[in-house]
Amino acid sequence: MSENHNEVELDAIGQKCPMPLLSTKKALSNIEKGQILKIIATDKNAVKDLKAFCEYTDHEFIDDRSENETFIIRILKG
């Protein structure tokens, strides 16, 4: 994980479902409330899984975008 001011980056490239979700849960437990976790993943289900995860937690799904076959997802820790 790398950190940039209020944004922490999680490299989940190459992880298959459910690992991006599990890695995200672990990363969120290690950052402060109000910080943003930026997840970089290649698993096609990561966006859907992380949106659903945020719906059932205090975390806010900020946005997602895709570049080539990589998905960039940002979550605000609640």
How does the language model describe each region?
Residues E7, G34-K38, T70-I72:
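Intrinsic-disorder/low-complexity, polar/charged segments enriched in Ser/Thr/Lys/Arg/Asp/Glu/Gln
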Residues D11, I40, R74-L76:
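Generic structural detector for well-ordered beta-strands
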Residues M1-H5:
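Short, compositionally biased "basic patch" segments
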Residues P18-M19, S23-E60:
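Amphipathic, hydrophobic secondary-structure cores in small proteins
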Residues N6-I13:
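Short amphipathic
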